[in-house]
Amino acid sequence: MNVKVENIEKNVVKLEITVDSEKFNEAVKKSFKKNAKRFNVPGFRKGKAPLNIIKKYYGEGVLFEDAINFCCEDTYPKAIEENNIKPVDYPQIDVVQIGEGKDFIYTAEVTTVPEVKLGEYKGVEVKKVSYEVEDEAVENELKSMQEKNARVSLKEEGEIEKGNIAIIDFKGYVDGKAFEGGEAKDYEIEIGSGTFIGDFEDQLVGLKKDESKEVNVSFPEEYGREDLNGKPATFEATIKDIKVKELPALDDEFAKEVSEFDTLEELKSDIKDRMKKELSEKAKAEYEEAVVEAVGANAEIEIPKVMIEKEIENMVRDLEMRLKYQGLDLKSYYEFTNSSEEKVKEYMRETAEKRVKTDLIMQEIAKVEDIKATEEELKEKAMEVAKQYGQKDVEKTAELIANAQKAYLEIDIVNGKVLDLLVENSKEIA
């Protein structure tokens, strides 16, 4: 095998690979063995005609397609490894010379991993991130717990008041026509919650059970549906039932009912501690992100478009999987959000580019700093992932993960180590 490498543009190389005639003839014979049974030649049982007869009857090129594939599968990986080429996509293969008794020559044009010029990555200055737990946040959490533990009962008499829960049937019209998603029966709505658009809920105040009313509201300008954005609408609403909500008193008895604590003060203290931990983790994550952004701002990379497109495709697949767990699909999502595949991909582009750039920088720093994942770390990471699956035989699951996802585990571990290095060497400023 002989290989010539030509840099045809930034991050794109063309390899001209020559496979000697003897090797190519072996590939042709291999192709014959694979395809012999599908050839039907007069005078021979199907699949029993010899190679020379097949060539004469069908033409010598009949076996070239698979022979080309066999040659490329064998020689292309060796060619890129020997020339230290790191492709980011599949190559474009073009045949230059092919024929019986001739060397097989082909070109492989491929986009490569771009050069990363690291700037300063140790000692970057990043603004300190910190959060304090506000008393109001603790009170709001208590109110939320109070709401969840409220007692709800039917209001036998009287009108709808703020804070009541109304069970309604409604049907909406825009420009005098019913619209999709504008109708529901036995819909439960808390008056004053702001669930409905405009002052829909306020207009129900004062109504009694079995009474109906025409409610007039307008959709927000950016409601998210072109057919409804900013448009006035009329809803026919009928009150089916009214419920009243009784909130439990916020006292020691409440604390005992909803938690492991004996007093309200102990419950408040626990809520505050949990919030402190959450805010501390949030501050840590934001600081780490800021460090990575600062390091990225100091680096120079010309990212090939194909890398960004591939990351966008990965993001779309992730979105599709998340939707699947919710019983939805991409088509429904596009319709519901009044979007399209093109719009969603364009929206993802900036994030995709940022992800690719960050990954390239992390890989380059790992290379410079000689940061690697040890076998022990790989086992620990595989075990950590295996536990998330909830399988009975965790060790067996971890072993399968370690074998099937080794490359991903290595990247995760190495990136974590690089991030630790960057954070440890950063300078926190006020």
Swiss-Prot record:
GO (cellular component) term, any one: cytoplasm
Q: Where in the cell is it found?
A: Cytoplasm
The enzyme's E.C. designation:
5.2.1.8
Q: Which cysteines are joined by disulfide bonds?
A: none
Q: Name one GO biological process term.
A: chaperone-mediated protein folding
Enzyme class, top EC level, equals: isomerase
SUPFAM superfamilies given for it?
FKBP-like (SSF54534), Triger factor/SurA peptide-binding domain-like (SSF109998), Trigger factor ribosome-binding domain (SSF102735)
Q: What reactions does this protein catalyze?
A: [protein]-peptidylproline (omega=180) = [protein]-peptidylproline (omega=0)
User: What is a single Pfam family found in this protein's UniProt entry?
Assistant: Trigger_N
Q: Which family does it belong to?
A: Belongs to the FKBP-type PPIase family. Tig subfamily.
Task: List the protein's name.
Answer: Trigger factor
Task: Provide the species name.
Answer: Clostridium botulinum (strain Langeland / NCTC 10281 / Type F)
Q: Which gene encodes it?
A: tig
